[in-house]
Amino acid sequence: MIHILYNFIVNQTEKRYKIYMNDNDFKKAYLDYLNELTIQTITSNKKSIYRISLPYLDSYNDYLDIYVIKNEDGSCTITDDGWTIRMLQDNKTLTEKDIATIKLYDIIKNEDNSLSITCYPGGNIGYCIHNLALCMLKIDSRHL
């Protein structure tokens, strides 16, 4: 049974790889890959909080987790739940350059040390998620 399952997985992987290699839509191939590896889960029914695990590794070889909070006014707050600043404080490496990087990506550092960006109705939530992820990765990579 295990051998059959293994062959199925290998065949599916080879099939997917061949399709992408023969296809000229590289953007679609990349986005499909990201979609396969991105996991979204609900963390709280009360506040409509969703955790999105992105397929990008931090310096601890963990996937980046961000949280999307659906607000009552229809906006969404995208946050790192304090991970970035906490990591810098644990390593005693928080610098002014990190604060400048946060501002560069239109991210807000909150009083609880979480980083966040708000996407209002009609806004581009993909842009907001992408900017927060880039900010987290940029700061994390500076402190390897």
Where are these regions (language model features)?
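Intrinsically disordered, low-complexity regulatory segments enriched in Ser/Thr/Pro
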Residues: 63-118
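Terminal targeting/leader modules
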Residues: 34-35, 116, 123
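Short, positively charged and aromatic/hydrophobic N-terminal segments
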Residues: 6-11, 17-18
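Solvent-exposed, charged helical/coil patches
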Residues: 119-144
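Generic hydrophobic, helix-prone segments enriched in Leu/Val/Ile
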Residues: 30-34, 97-104, 129, 136-139
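N-terminal ordered "arm"
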Residues: 19-79
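Short glycine-rich, low-complexity/disordered patches
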Residues: 39-52, 108-114, 141-144
